[in-house]
Amino acid sequence: PNLELHDLMRQFTRQIVQGKSKDFDASQIILVCGAERSGKTLLSKKLAKFLPTHTAAQNSTLILQNNRVIADPLSGDLNSLFKSSSDANVTSLFRKRQDIALDGSRLIVDYEGPMDLLNSVLMRLETLEHKPQVSVIYTLEVGKSYDAVRQALEVLQIPNLSVALTKMDLLEVSISELSAVFDLGTKIQFFSGLKTLEDGLDFAKISVVEDFLLDIVRQDGL
């Protein structure tokens, strides 16, 4: 392709690929949300298995904590779960769950609640005195139209939300889908489905998306 077209593709790619994020790296809680059967449960497991864990000090020894996964709607009696008093902390949110302890591990939430309640969940997390660093990942199954992708992402309206493209072992992402992500100013952070859970987690890379676009350009003879 000519240099001008190559530069345009590079600019386009840089707008839609998240790249390394210090905020995400520091996250204590990662909420994974998405449509039913969009691959969010598998992605939650991948994140827990392959993301680095924080370390916790115990008797002057650094203990590596395993990341935890819970599947939870975070709904019901939310007012009793979220505390704003001086003793508020992340563990009070899940105090009925014996398997939860944020003592160095990350908590990956496979979010099972309605999407229209997710903003409420995030707002209440912000009211905790010991504010946890929270990231939100939306699992977007590839193989959809421009309008379907735009509609799915538009209704969320969650700041700093990033996307994981899922089921990429079954279908190839289209330029229409990438264009919808671009038009909404959303960033892609993960590719899921290119490898099995045992093989690893794919962070979205600018070079990978550029190569994909270049292949399409070559096929079209541009």
Model-derived segments and spans:
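Conserved beta-strand/loop subsegment of P-loop NTPase cores
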Residues: 133-140, 157-198
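Conserved ATPase-coupling elements of RecA-like P-loop NTPase cores
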Residues: 115-122, 147-151, 173-176
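Conserved catalytic network of the ASCE P-loop NTPase/AAA+ motor domain
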Residues: 22-24, 53-56, 85, 98-104, ...
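NTP-binding/hydrolysis catalytic cores, primarily Walker-type P-loop NTPases
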Residues: 1, 181-222
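Glycine-rich phosphate-binding P-loop
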Residues: 29-53
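Switch II (G3) loop of P-loop NTPases
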Residues: 33-38, 63-124, 128-130, 138-142
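Post-Walker A helix-loop "phosphate-sensing" segment adjacent to the P-loop in P-loop NTPases
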Residues: 49-63, 69-70
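Extreme N-terminal, non-catalytic leader segments
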Residues: 1-27
